């Protein structure tokens, strides 16, 4: 295939973003269906297709690369120390395969930011792009902190009381998990800057928001999650990513006023 044809295909994809999004994600879904290693459940793949269409059509390859990075890195860290976590009864269900509830618990905030960028007022787009990156930075930070903490945390304590608790306890944190989570959130923010979705300052805002939101999520887990049956891990994840996006936007808005 020569360069002129590739250029024409690329121009057409930009001219018809929703159509190209459907074609691209259908192709990737077909590849996933025949891949020997399944990272999602069958329904999870269907919902991921919807998410992928939204992200590609609204944000193009830049936004798509961010969500792919979150998905593959998040799936990889979930499998860290898998056998040990399964033996202790603290591993993710379905051996880490994600279902629809996981897809939207992790990405609903990002999808709404992407749709708002595509259809909302132009003055909001820079803030919404920051919210998009920060939501995934937050979720990757949370996932990494949790999985590394469960696998390698030497001392695990409840965030609200600092009392020692077993690994995998809701609201538990560890030094190892916290540091790994911070690094993961920073890495995702750097990627967002690298593809041009956020400014250099956005790296700081996104990383700081991810750190704050991840710890707030631990507080929710320690204080409320066991009291309210409807407050599932997926609902908490949705709250977590919303907080990450909102905090990042709030920090940037405050910085602009100073």
UniProtKB/Swiss-Prot annotation:
It comes from the Bacteria. InterPro entries: DUF92_TMEM19 (IPR002794). One of its GO terms (cellular component) is membrane. It is a multi-pass membrane protein. Keywords: Cell membrane, Membrane, Transmembrane, Transmembrane helix. The keyword Oxidoreductase does not apply. It holds the Pfam family DUF92. It is found in: Cell membrane. The chain crosses the membrane at residues 14-34, 53-73, 110-130, 185-205, 238-258. Belongs to the TMEM19 family. This is Uncharacterized membrane protein sll0875. It comes from Synechocystis sp. (strain ATCC 27184 / PCC 6803 / Kazusa).
């Amino acid at each position: 295939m020569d360069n002129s044809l590739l250029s024409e295909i690329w121009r057409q994809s930009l001219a018809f973003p929703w159509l190209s999004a459907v074609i691209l994600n259908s192709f990737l879904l077909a590849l996933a269906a025949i891949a020997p290693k399944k990272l999602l459940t069958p329904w999870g793949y269907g919902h991921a297709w919807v998410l992928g269409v939204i992200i590609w059509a609204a944000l193009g390859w830049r936004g798509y690369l961010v969500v792919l990075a979150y998905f593959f890195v998040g799936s990889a860290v979930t499998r860290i120390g898998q056998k040990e976590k399964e033996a202790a009864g603290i591993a993710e269900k379905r051996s880490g395969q994600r279902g629809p509830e996981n897809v939207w618990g992790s990405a609903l905030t990002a999808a709404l930011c992407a749709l708002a960028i595509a259809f909302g007022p132009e003055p909001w787009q820079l803030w919404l792009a920051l919210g998009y990156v920060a939501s995934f930075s937050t979720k990757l930070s949370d996932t990494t902190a949790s999985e590394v903490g469960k696998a390698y945390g030497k001392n695990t304590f409840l965030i609200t009381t600092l009392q020692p608790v077993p690994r995998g306890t809701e609201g538990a944190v560890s030094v190892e998990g916290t540091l790994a989570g911070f690094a993961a959130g920073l890495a995702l923010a750097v990627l967002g800057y690298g593809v041009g979705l956020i400014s250099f300052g956005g790296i700081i805002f996104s990383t700081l928001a991810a750190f704050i939101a991840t710890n707030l999520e631990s507080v929710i887990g320690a204080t409320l999650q066991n009291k309210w049956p409807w407050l599932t891990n997926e609902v908490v994840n949705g709250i977590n990513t919303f907080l990450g996006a909102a905090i990042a936007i709030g920090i940037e808005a405050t910085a602009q006023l100073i």
